[in-house]
Amino acid sequence: MIKTTLLFFATALCEIIGCFLPWLWLKRNASIWLLLPAGISLALFVWLLTLHPAASGRVYAAYGGVYVCTALIWLRVVDGVKLSLYDWTGALIALCGMLIIVAGWGRT
């Protein structure tokens, strides 16, 4: 379970970086060269999703919970926005959903 969760967090980080770099290019007039590491990051994101031993839809559903938590960490660390009680509550609910889905992988 810990290995799966850590893999999901790495996957989410790759997805967020892969989307953030083009955002910088489009919104902040950053270098177009940021699209190259963005593409690599998104390719790594896709590859990491294939490393889970469950059906793709189940992996995507469980991953969504970790993505929510990772995006909120990004919001706090990179964007500098203080998280609200609603952010924390939503993250906890999403993470619990992920844990329930992953716990059932070997039982279905």
UniProtKB/Swiss-Prot annotation:
Bilayer topology term: Multi-pass membrane protein
Cytoplasmic side: 27-30, 82-84
Record GO cellular component, one term: plasma membrane
A family per Pfam: UPF0060
Domain of life: Bacteria
Main location (coarse class): membrane
Transmembrane segments: 6-26, 31-51, 61-81, 85-105
UniProt-listed HAMAP family: UPF0060
Protein's UniProt name: UPF0060 membrane protein YnfA
Species name: Escherichia coli (strain SMS-3-5 / SECEC)
Lineage of producing organism: Bacteria, Pseudomonadati, Pseudomonadota, Gammaproteobacteria, Enterobacterales
Gene assigned in the entry: ynfA
